[in-house]
Amino acid sequence: MTCAAGRKDAQWWITNEFVESTLSKEEQLNEMEWFISVAKPFQNLTIRVVSEPIATHWYEANVLTKAFTDITGINVVHETTAEDDVVTKMETQIELGVNIYDAYIGDSDLIGTHFRSGKVVNLTDFIKNEGKDVTLPSLDLDDFIGLSFTTGLDGKLYQLPDQQFANLYWYRHDWFSRPDLKAKFKSIYGYELGVPENWSAYEDIADFFTNKVKKIDGITVYGHMDYGKKDPSLAWRFSDAWLSMAGAGDKGLPNGMPVDEWGIRVIDCHPVGASVARGGALNSPAAVYALRKYKEWLVKFAPPEAINMDERLSLPIIGQGNIAQQIFWYTAYTAILTDPSLPVTDSDGIPKWRMAPSPKGAYWEPGMKMGYQDVGAWTLLKNTPLNRRKAAWLYAQFVVSKTVSLRKLLVGLTPIRKSDINSEAFSKAANRYGGLVEFYRSNARNSWTPTGLNVPNYPFLSDVWWIYVSLAITGTHSAQQAMNKMAQEMDNRLQQIAINGQERCEPRLNKPKDENYWLSQPGAPKPKLSNEEPPGKTTSYEESLKAWD
């Protein structure tokens, strides 16, 4: 490919696809000319990358790969597959020592794994040394909102954010605004129907719609939606910060320290245990409360079929128009719920629903993380040959470049750059997205965070969640019994990680002590509250947004 051909293609893409950008057309073209120039050594090379199948990555795989090839002459095979399969593929490449993919867009939930393994490229050093000649001068790392989530304990960057989405509270704003429903709720519960600030209010609202209202416009309605099938997706339902929402961990951002939302205690970077007996919080009163409430609401207030659903089957339900609220909802599905054909939007696709701050459990305290945020981030492995790694790094930077990123945001609604979030184009779209713009423009985006550095091997530990949570859902175990077994298994696996060895900061388990010793210490694990059911508290949607600041 000649530079002239690449420049002509770049002009076409800027004019016809990358119309929205925080850069001027001239600045966009200058950025693309840099890609054309540095791509010369990699002409006709085909690189392979893989990611999970959300809308943002579909756009990359089906549109941005073509743009990148047209402009640079580098071919890209961008596969999309299930999230757990992405992790499996990465693990396989590391274990075999054979290059399978040249780059991965993987969850930053693995940051504790990557930092300890010694198998992942440290991007901070890479862009200063062997990757310096292929690092975009206008990359502008300070513009990324999620770097604290992809940084190791050594202060080095191990992953570059490609997309982000949070897990927030979702509710039918139109129903909550109806005078008849507001009056009926207040007459029963003694306070206003509004955005719940705590789990007690969420439970009251769930009870109200499921058991008191029952039908709206002739349709049976429910005050809660969730899923409960014994399935790997049940793990995300809990590992994606359910325990932190209940208040099980310690204060600290992006994750609680020394005890995080997985209940794992860390001392001097070494995980020392998840069970209360070892100083962890995985079977603490707060964790048991979290599991008990999850099951109780699922059984009492959700549609009867929900308990047998996995995440995939449960996703479309709130769009069908008979769910009043959902405490655990990923903003990655915002675009899906703006379809004008759905009963949850008007004929123009304007939402009848809103997203708002997640209500807090009884053990939650100010200074703790408030919920979960997913960060899919570019990850390079050391066993990828340098020339292929460089070419993949070019593609990674292309899809997050300022030329491309705003257009990608408007397609996938998974923001990564401050400049895009504050752009006029994002402002114009705000009324279509039910609170997404307001969330990402607030400081709240720093309090909804991914799994952090306390988790030393995410792939090896993650299935513990769904295996043991399911014991409580099926009724074979109480919540306490299930969490006791889970904590014991987590400790066992931490010990196995220590035996297998890690390059640094491997687990060093505490010797077990009487649980009362740890429960009497400050912070997590926290002793059982005398009252886990404080009075319900709600606020208006407008006031709830102020909480984000």
PLM regions: where:
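Extracytoplasmic/periplasmic substrate-recognition and gating elements
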Residues: 151, 299-305, 313, 323, ...
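Periplasmic solute-binding protein
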Residues: 63, 108-128, 144-191, 203, ...
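Long, aromatic- and glycine/proline-rich binding clefts that accommodate carbohydrate-like moieties
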Residues: 32-33, 46, 351-360, 409-473, ...
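Hinge/lid segment of periplasmic solute-binding proteins
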Residues: 13-41, 108-168, 260-263, 352-358, ...
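Short, polar/charged alpha-helical segment
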Residues: 32-38, 55-73, 170, 174, ...
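Immediate post-signal peptide segment of exported/extracytoplasmic ligand-binding proteins
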Residues: 3-49, 69-70, 154-156, 210-220, ...
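Glycine-centered hinge/linker elements that transmit conformational signals in sensory
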Residues: 201-207, 244-308, 358
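Extracytoplasmic "Venus flytrap"/periplasmic binding protein-like
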Residues: 63-143, 178-180, 184-186, 324-325, ...
